[in-house]
Structure formats: structure tokens, C-alpha cells
């Protein structure tokens, strides 16, 4: 029903399945249209361009970038349900004469309406080796909520079943949660690798691909079955794959036609 409404206002998608619609368009236009039609999103998961001049992005002036990103985040706020979450994967920016690794969080702090509920550290393990710095091995996932006192969070869905730490009850007895350990706010999940003889099985031609294990945890932990999930920079389509695998609906915006083709090929191989 929700996807039918989306198609009514946005038109024919670039690609669709029973539970996913992908639009080849600027996400700002898409978010504005969703707001105008009164549709609400249960959870948004995304990783916008970091503005560090990578091959797939145009570098902006810092203030311009902050305004651009804040306008998108506030647009997402306007279309989020009262119990909804926004999971934002961010990296670091270099500010000339001030800092080499400044968290994007600091730039957004006073300019967005969401409540920052928690910062998740994604420790991806392998990466670039540095000689004059500590080698970077993590990125952040900022967990924003609309209502600080009431939000969707399914801890039991994302517990680590292989680790069961005992805890003490009021009567002094020790017991373990049979579903496993709380995964904590540090997630050890390997990144998608590339290169001859070392490329991940899920690797596509997208240069900044989310690993399925990462987004799978986000989808299960911060949304409910049949919820509507948005990824405004859907890139390689990992969010859509995880929505299909976990019984969620997904809207994805991607401005690159080449990446939309990657998504089409990938979703054609994914069971719906």
C-alpha cells in the first residue's frame, strides 16, 4: 500500500520488486515529494558522500557541505514516524588549519532536529596502513531518533547468540540471556573488500559498498517487519537486499544511473 502511494506520486521507478522501489533521482527531490504526499518513513539508513573528493563525489566548500547535508537530514526528520530512527554512517573531514579527522557529527550538531541517541563504532578491521598516523579502522554510525523516550529497538533480534555473559538477578543468582549477548556499541564487522584473490563474495563495482552483515543488523534492530525503510543514497543496494531478506519495504534514491544498474542486477539475484 505504501509503495503504491509512492509510485503514484513519484511515477514509475527505475527498478522495482514486490517490496522495493528504486528511483534514479536526487534524494532531496524525492524526500520533498514524500513529505508533500503525507507518507511517513519508519527508519532511514544511509551513508552520504563524505565530501573528501573521492571519485564518486564532487567536493564542496565545508559550509556548503554542512548546509547540504543538514537540509537532507531535516527533510528526513519531517517524514519520519514518531517512533522512527535514522541511522547515519559518517566518516571524518579535514578542516584546513584546524583538524585532520573532524567527526561530521560536530558540524551537524546545532543544525538538525533529530535527537542523537547513541554513537555506534563500526570496527571494520582491515584498511589503509599509515606511517605518520594510527591506521584508521573504524567509522561511526549515528543513531538518531525522533522521540527520545519512545522508539523502535529490537535488542533480542540482534543479540550475539555465540556469547552469553552471565548477569546477577536481585536474588543473587546468576543467569544468562538465552538469546545471547547485547552486541554493544562497538560492532566488529568486516568491510567489503576488493582486489584479486581477496574480493568479498558480495562485492560489486560500487566503490563504497555497505556489507550485508552491517545493514542486516541495523534493519533487524531498528525497524519492525513490514516497516518502510528509506535509503536516500542507496549506492550498491545493500539496504534493499537486507530489506528483502528481512521482510521490510524499501525506497531507494540513487542519482547515478550506473549504480542503479548495479542495484538492478543485484536485486534480480536476491530472493523476494
Q: Which residue ranges define each predicted feature?
A:
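Core catalytic lobe of class I
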Residues: 2-3, 7-261
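Cysteine-dependent PTP/DSP-like catalytic domain, specifically the C-terminal lobe
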Residues: 258-272
Amino acid at each position: 500500500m505504501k509503495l503504491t502511494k509512492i509510485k503514484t506520486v513519484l511515477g514509475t521507478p527505475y527498478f522495482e520488486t514486490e517490496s522495493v522501489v528504486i528511483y534514479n533521482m536526487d534524494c532531496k527531490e524525492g524526500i520533498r515529494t514524500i513529505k508533500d504526499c503525507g507518507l511517513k518513513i519508519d527508519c532511514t539508513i544511509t551513508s552520504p558522500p563524505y565530501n573528501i573528493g573521492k571519485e564518486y563525489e564532487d567536493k564542496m566548500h565545508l559550509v556548503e557541505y554542512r548546509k547540504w547535508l543538514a537540509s537532507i537530514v531535516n527533510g528526513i526528520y519531517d517524514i519520519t514516524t514518531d517512533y522512527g530512527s535514522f541511522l547515519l554512517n559518517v566518516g571524518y573531514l579535514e578542516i584546513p588549519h584546524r583538524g585532520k579527522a573532524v567527526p561530521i557529527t560536530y558540524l551537524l550538531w546545532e543544525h538538525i532536529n533529530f535527537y542523537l541517541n547513541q554513537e555506534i563504532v563500526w570496527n571494520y578491521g582491515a584498511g589503509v596502513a599509515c606511517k605518520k598516523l594510527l591506521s584508521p579502522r573504524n567509522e561511526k554510525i549515528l543513531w538518531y531518533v525522533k522521540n527520545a523516550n519512545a522508539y523502535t529497538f529490537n535488542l533480542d533480534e540482534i543479540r550475539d547468540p555465540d556469547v552469553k555473559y552471565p548477569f546477577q538477578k536481585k536474588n543473587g543468582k546468576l543467569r544468562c540471556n538465552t538469546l545471547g549477548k547485547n552486541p554493544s556499541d562497538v560492532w566488529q564487522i568486516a568491510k567489503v573488500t576488493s582486489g584479486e584473490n581477496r574480493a568479498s563474495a558480495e562485492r560489486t563495482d560500487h566503490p563504497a559498498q555497505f556489507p550485508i552483515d552491517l545493514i542486516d543488523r541495523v534493519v533487524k534492530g531498528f525497524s519492525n517487519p513490514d516497516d518502510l525503510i528509506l535509503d536516500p543514497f542507496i549506492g550498491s543496494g545493500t539496504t534493499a537486499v537486507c530489506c528483502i531478506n528481512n521482510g521490510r519495504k524499501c525506497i531507494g534514491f540513487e542519482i547515478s544511473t550506473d549504480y542503479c544498474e548495479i542495484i538492478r542486477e543485484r536485486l534480480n539475484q536476491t530472493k523476494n
